[in-house]
């Protein structure tokens, strides 16, 4: 699960979770990243959705705030900033990275995941629905290892670790979604990860 892969890269104790609600607030789901982070670390969360933050507060979740990922200001620094499936939604990814850097302690870490646009799954989706190439209409851009590395370098980060992972969500009941994943899983036994994995997971550190 993506959340478990992200957790392996997080250093504490202080963690900022950007986009903390996820697509939906799912505290009862094992893959809900914000819940997993709170089990291990001292976590602050921000999300642009007022309704999702209100819902989370109604569940007793504290230290969460309605703020935008590319303009947030919290007045403190963190050991790790986590941004799971956020950067592809933003109008200004570079400005987002600049805000993250301001909120990291020296030698702090940014852990980021984003769809890998050259995955076979996305190629199959595009072939089926072209000119629509992405199921999520709120995505504004695609990244690959080269482009995300260069963008990060321009904003004062360097890559510490990266890998390609799967992002299968067992809570999705769509028959077509599950058929896609069954096909990808089968092909994954025959083809390299660079063709079958769907998500990039990267840990960055601040350049001195």
Task: Please report, for each region that a protein language model flagged, where it lies by residue.
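S-adenosyl-L-methionine-dependent methyltransferase catalytic module, highlighting the catalytic core
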Residues: 20, 70, 91-208
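Structural signature of beta-strand start/N-cap positions in the alpha/beta core
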Residues: 14, 42, 77-79, 109
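Conserved alpha-helix/loop element of class I SAM-dependent methyltransferases that forms part
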Residues: 1-13, 28-33
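Short conserved AdoMet
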Residues: 10-11, 38, 91, 105
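A short beta-strand submotif of the Rossmann-like class I SAM-dependent methyltransferase core
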Residues: 83-86
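A short acidic, Gly/Pro-enriched loop at the edge of an enzyme's catalytic core
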Residues: 71-81
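Class I SAM-dependent methyltransferase core
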Residues: 17
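Class I SAM-dependent methyltransferase SAM/SAH-binding core
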Residues: 21-72
């Amino acid at each position: 699960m993506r959340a478990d892969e992200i957790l392996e890269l997080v250093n504490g104790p202080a963690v900022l979770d950007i986009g903390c609600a996820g697509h939906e607030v799912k505290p009862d789901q094992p893959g809900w990243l914000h819940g997993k982070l709170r089990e291990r670390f001292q976590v602050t969360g921000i999300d642009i959705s007022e309704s999702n933050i209100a819902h989370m507060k109604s569940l007793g979740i504290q230290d969460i705030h309605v703020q935008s990922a590319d303009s947030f200001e919290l007045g403190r620094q963190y050991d790790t900033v986590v941004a799971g499936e956020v950067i592809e939604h933003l109008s200004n990814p570079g400005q987002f990275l600049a805000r993250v850097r301001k909120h990291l302690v020296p030698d702090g870490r940014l852990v980021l995941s984003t769809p890998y646009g050259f995955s076979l799954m996305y190629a199959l989706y595009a072939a089926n629905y072209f000119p629509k190439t992405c199921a999520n209409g709120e995505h504004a851009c695609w990244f690959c290892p080269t482009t995300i590395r260069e963008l990060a370098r321009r904003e004062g980060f360097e890559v510490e670790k990266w890998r390609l992972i799967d992002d299968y969500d067992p809570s999705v009941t769509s028959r077509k979604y599950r058929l896609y994943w069954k096909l990808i899983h089968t092909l994954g036994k025959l083809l390299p990860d660079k063709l079958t994995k769907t998500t990039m997971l990267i840990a960055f550190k601040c350049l001195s």
